[in-house]
Amino acid sequence: QLAKAVLTIVIVTSSSEEKLARAAALGADHGINYRQHPEWSRQVLEITGGRGVDHVIEVGGPGTLTQSMRSACVGGHIALIGVLTGAADVVPTVELMLRQQRISGIGVGNRRHQIELVRAVEATGVRPVIDRSFALADLAAAFRLQQAGGHFGKIGIDYGPAPGTIR
């Protein structure tokens, strides 16, 4: 949604046609089912006329990084924001160098970044998609849902009232 708010062409990947349809309803221009197309970078290159994309938001991690690199253009940027496929694997460094690409590990950010993000969300009217919320006591169930990959959007954790507040 944020990418669409700044007039970007958005290509999303998912293992689920239902999730791809939901992403399209939220503004995604193209959807690729990576189970049907394990070498999904080929579809990205087809969509972009062989050029590749400027930016990849990589949530899969090691298991999908090579496809993300092959989807990005020469000089493209890959923002690694998740590691759903595992913590470590081989990075094809020669391919990375030949493509002159950059990979950045992106964390949650500091307070200033969060404030800027909230302002951007408010300015664009984007509404974050929250699949489900769990009480803190059900944290294990939230992690199981995330691991199963059945959610669409964010999984929230309700910590309860802030200390000193009355509910």
Language model features: what each stretch is:
Residues 1-37:
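Mid-domain Rossmann-like dinucleotide-binding core that forms the NAD(H)/NADP(H) cofactor-binding site
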Residues 14-22, 87-93, 113-115:
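Short, glycine/polar-rich helix-capping loops at beta-to-alpha or helix-loop-helix junctions
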Residues 36, 60-61, 82-83:
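Short glycine-/small-residue-rich Rossmann-like dinucleotide-binding loops
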Residues 38-50:
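Short amphipathic alpha-helix with an adjacent loop that forms part of the alpha/beta core around
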Residues 54-57:
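N-terminal Rossmann-like NAD(P) cofactor-binding module of classical short-chain dehydrogenase/reductase
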Residues 63-73:
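Rossmann-fold NAD(P) dinucleotide-binding segment
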Residues 66, 111-167:
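C-terminal hydrophobic helical "lid"/dimerization subdomain
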Residues 74-81, 90-132:
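Rossmann-fold dehydrogenase core element
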